[in-house]
């Protein structure tokens, strides 16, 4: 066998072996492929089954959610229906109450109308009486003229006096008689009017005052800040006093640090600055960080906080007295009065008290109670700005009321409550009276000893300046002046006129809270000795 044949045989064997090997691989691959296909098909079936189960689960959940949503919607609908029914019932009840109040108001108006009708009838009757009295006086004047003419002729006939001499005698007699009659008439009229006025005024004032309850404690000019321990005083002073100097410079308040245990005193005449200082110092003590930068930060912060607090004070006071629909700026200005004092009395508390007293007086007198309260509440509003704006607190308050378009009666009340202008309504007079009552009640106000002594001296000086006065004494803390006259200089009739003159001088020349009683005493003593 040649080499070529051997090679071909070898190649043939190799090909056969390769063919057999390939056939085996193909069969194996086919089996693997079938296995993979079956496995994939099984997984696909599992996925389909899982998806189907998931879909059924989601469907069940959707059904459950749908039922729950339908139930929730039904409950919400029922709840809204109940709320609407409750609101309807409440509105119907409010409507019934409103109708009831309107009916009561109508009855009150009917009663007032009947009262006015009766007053008109009384006025007509008084007018008729006045006409009759006028006619009677005219006839009396004619009779007196006739009698005077007869007297003149008789005097001329008897005394042979001239017309001028007779006239002088008659005038002298008439003048003396009229002086005595005038003094008696004045005394009787005053006694009668005083008795009736005192009785009526005491009744009205007692009814008004007993419905008002107020504090009788006057405001102080110092505030006390408590400290956790005395070691805090050194921290407040600071190194070389820099903390206390910064505090006093920023607040304008004196810080008094003495031997008082665990306390620091803040002294200053301006309550607003003193309140800012008190708030700042309390926060510094509580925080513990006391240095100039922190002091400056807290002072500025508390200034803004106090502005907000003043508005709250004004709103609360306006609500208390029933002064509705006040301009927000007016309420803020009224809130400033919480930090103002007059003779030691808190001006906002005084305004609230005047509002209540004026309202009670107006109710007793048949005037508009709400308007009287509003006017009384605003009567001292000018005191909130009298340090910042030129003019008296009356002028400032009047301009503020005009600016914010208050009722003309309120404007006139503010302008007239110290007698600067003429009161144009009964409410203005009632507010002035309420102002005097609030200021004059015991404990409401406090005067310095210098002003107190000066007022007593001025009172005695006015009384002793009249002719015939021997001496005068101011009694009861200046609420009464007793004038002793010389009996040989003034008669009993003349001291009645003297009392009125002293009273007028005091009203014109002095400012004082409340009333001053003027008592003139004429005493005659006859002395002899038995030997």
Curated annotation (Swiss-Prot):
Residues covered by the HD domain:
347-440
List where this protein forms a coiled coil: none
One GO CC term, this protein: plasma membrane
Please tell me whether the keyword Mitochondrion is annotated for this protein: no
Q: Where are the transmembrane segments?
A: 3-23
Keywords, ordered alphabetically: Cell membrane, Endonuclease, Hydrolase, Membrane, Nuclease, RNA-binding, Transmembrane, Transmembrane helix
Stored PROSITE patterns = HD, KH_TYPE_1
Name the Pfam families for this protein: HD, KH_1, RNase_Y_N
Please name the GO terms of the biological process aspect recorded for this protein, alphabetically.
Answer: mRNA catabolic process
Q: Where in the cell is it found?
A: Cell membrane
Q: Where is the KH domain?
A: 221-281
* Gene Ontology molecular function: RNA binding; RNA endonuclease activity
Assigned protein family: Belongs to the RNase Y family.
> What is the protein's given name?
Ribonuclease Y
Question: Gene encoding this polypeptide?
Answer: rny
């Amino acid at each position: 066998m040649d080499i070529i044949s051997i090679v071909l045989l070898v190649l043939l064997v190799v090909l056969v072996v390769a063919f057999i090997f390939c056939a085996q691989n193909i069969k194996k691959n086919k089996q693997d492929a079938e296995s993979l296909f079956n496995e994939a098909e099984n997984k696909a079936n599992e996925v389909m089954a899982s998806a189907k189960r998931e879909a059924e689960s989601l469907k069940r959940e959707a059904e459950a959610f749908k039922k729950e949503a339908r139930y929730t919607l039904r409950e919400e609908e029922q709840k809204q229906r109940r709320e609407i029914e409750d609101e309807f019932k409440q509105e119907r009840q409010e409507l019934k109450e409103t109708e009831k109040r309107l009916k009561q108001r109508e009855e009150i108006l009917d009663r007032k109308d009947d009262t006015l009708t009766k007053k008109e009838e009384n006025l007509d009757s008084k007018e008729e009486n006045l006409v009759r009295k006028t006619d009677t006086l005219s006839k009396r004047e004619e009779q007196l003229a006739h009698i005077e003419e007869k007297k003149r002729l008789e005097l001329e006939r008897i005394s042979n006096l001239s017309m001028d001499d007779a006239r002088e005698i008659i005038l002298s007699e008439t003048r003396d008689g009229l002086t005595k009659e005038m003094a008696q008439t004045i005394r009787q009229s005053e006694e009668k009017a005083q008795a009736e006025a005192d009785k009526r005024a005491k009744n009205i004032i007692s009814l008004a005052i007993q419905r008002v309850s107020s504090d009788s404690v006057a405001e102080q000019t110092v505030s006390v800040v408590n400290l956790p321990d005395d070691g805090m005083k050194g921290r407040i002073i600071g190194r070389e006093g820099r903390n206390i100097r910064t505090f006093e410079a920023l607040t304008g308040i004196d810080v008094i640090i003495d031997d008082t245990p665990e306390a620091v005193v803040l002294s200053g005449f301006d309550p607003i600055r003193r309140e800012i200082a008190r708030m700042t110092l309390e926060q510094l003590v509580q925080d513990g960080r006391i240095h100039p930068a922190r002091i400056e930060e807290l002072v500025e912060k508390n200034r803004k906080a106090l502005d907000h607090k003043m508005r709250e004070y004004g709103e609360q006071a306006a609500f208390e007295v029933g002064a509705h629909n006040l301009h927000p700026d007016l309420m803020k200005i009224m809130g400033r009065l919480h930090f103002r004092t007059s003779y030691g009395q808190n001006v906002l508390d005084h305004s609230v008290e005047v509002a209540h007293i004026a309202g009670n007086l107006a109710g007793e007198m048949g005037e508009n109670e709400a308007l009287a309260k509003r006017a009384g509440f605003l009567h001292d509003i000018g005191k909130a700005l009298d340090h910042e704006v030129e003019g008296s607190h009356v002028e400032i308050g009047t301009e503020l009321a005009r600016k914010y378009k208050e009722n003309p009666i309120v404007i006139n009340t503010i302008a007239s409550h110290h007698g600067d202008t003429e009161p144009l309504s009964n409410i203005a007079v009632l507010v002035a009276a309420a102002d005097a009552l609030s200021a004059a009640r015991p404990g409401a106000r406090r005067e310095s000893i210098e002003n107190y002594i000066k007022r007593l001296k001025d009172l005695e000086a006015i009384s002793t300046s009249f002719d015939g006065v021997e001496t005068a004494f101011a009694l009861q803390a200046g609420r009464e002046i007793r004038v002793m006259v010389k009996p040989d200089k003034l008669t009993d009739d003349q001291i009645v006129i003297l009392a009125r003159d002293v009273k007028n001088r005091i009203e014109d020349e002095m400012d004082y809270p409340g009333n001053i009683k003027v008592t003139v005493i004429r005493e005659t003593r006859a002395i002899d000795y038995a030997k």
